[in-house]
């Protein structure tokens, strides 16, 4: 469980990297609790002077619950929200008011939030194909999304194909690329199962070569992620977002490799 004290200690190690923003996920406090998320976002913003982006999911939420969550965010001075549908867990009842992120985004805009939304370079697993998924992406933009953050991907070529198609579909909002270094073979298997991400041959070789050597796997994966980031930056993407899973050393090491490449 990520307590406020652990969040404070973890995030403090990112301050010297000067990130444009830091995410507080909707389950950051150890449960799907919007107050826990807003508390961590407030720590980022008020104590560490970093721009916070709070995640907010709506798939099982009532209008009253969302209104309460937005009140709490505004009271704490949080201005940036990533609007997500979220996945239902066993025992939860689907919301009748919020079926998609497009139902949540207009409420956030009415409240004056800067709103981000999710993008899927390889299409959301529930979509037939990327073309269908791009229709939903455009709907999020039309609903008021100011920017997008992508699901993680390991193959930059998948992103470049998506980027071209998104522009052709009328997407003008900035798209920030989400990159996550893999820390274990099990983690990758979960991502492939849950998100449908593809694995380039190079990352498969890394996983197989270092399956029984966690330290070497970690080092090789961070180097691979840094190569992705460098290539994306050279292609002039709108932004880069590292999914560190509360491991600040991942961001520190990736940034070190990026800076070395730019010298």
Give the residues covered by each predicted segment.
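Active-site pocket-lining/capping segments in soluble small-molecule metabolic enzymes
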Residues: 96-121, 169-222, 227, 258-263
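Glycine-rich anion/phosphate-binding loops
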Residues: 58-71, 95-99
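C-terminal helical cap(s) of enzyme catalytic domains, especially alpha/beta-barrels
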Residues: 159, 248-263
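Conserved, mostly hydrophobic/aromatic
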Residues: 22, 73, 140, 144, ...
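Active-site glycine-rich loop that binds ribose-phosphate moieties when present
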Residues: 126-148
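Active-site mouth loops of central-metabolism enzymes
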Residues: 1-7, 52-64, 116-132, 209-223
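Acidic (Asp/Glu)-rich catalytic clusters
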Residues: 11-18, 38-49, 70-78, 106-110, ...
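Glycine-rich, proline-tolerant flexible connector loops at the mouths of alpha/beta enzymes
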Residues: 15-40, 87-96, 145-159, 244-248
């Amino acid at each position: 469980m990520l307590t406020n004290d652990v969040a404070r200690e973890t995030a403090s190690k990112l301050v010297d990297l000067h990130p444009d923003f830091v995410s507080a996920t909707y389950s950051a406090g150890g449960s799907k609790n919007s107050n826990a998320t807003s508390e961590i976002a407030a720590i980022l913003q008020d104590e560490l002077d970093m721009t916070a982006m709070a995640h907010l999911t709506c798939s099982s939420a009532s209008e009253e619950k969302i209104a309460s969550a937005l009140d709490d965010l505004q009271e704490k001075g949080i201005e940036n929200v990533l609007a997500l549908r979220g996945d239902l867990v066993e025992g939860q009842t689907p919301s009748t008011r919020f079926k998609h992120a497009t139902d949540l985004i207009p409420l956030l805009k009415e409240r004056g939030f800067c709103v981000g939304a999710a993008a899927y370079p390889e299409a959301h697993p529930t979509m037939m194909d990327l073309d269908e998924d791009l229709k939903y992406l455009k709907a999020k933009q039309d609903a008021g999304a100011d920017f997008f953050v992508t699901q993680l991907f390991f193959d930059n070529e998948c992103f470049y194909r998506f980027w071209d198609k998104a522009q052709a579909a009328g997407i003008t909002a900035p798209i920030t690329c989400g990159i996550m270094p893999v820390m274990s073979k099990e983690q990758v298997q979960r991502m492939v199962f849950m998100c449908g991400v593809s694995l380039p041959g190079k990352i498969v070789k890394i996983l197989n070569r270092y399956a029984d050597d966690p330290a070497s796997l970690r080092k090789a994966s961070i180097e691979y992620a840094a190569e992705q980031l460098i290539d994306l930056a050279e292609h002039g993407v709108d932004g880069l977002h590292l999914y560190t899973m509360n491991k600040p050393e991942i961001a520190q090491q990736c940034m070190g490799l990026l800076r070395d490449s730019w010298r």
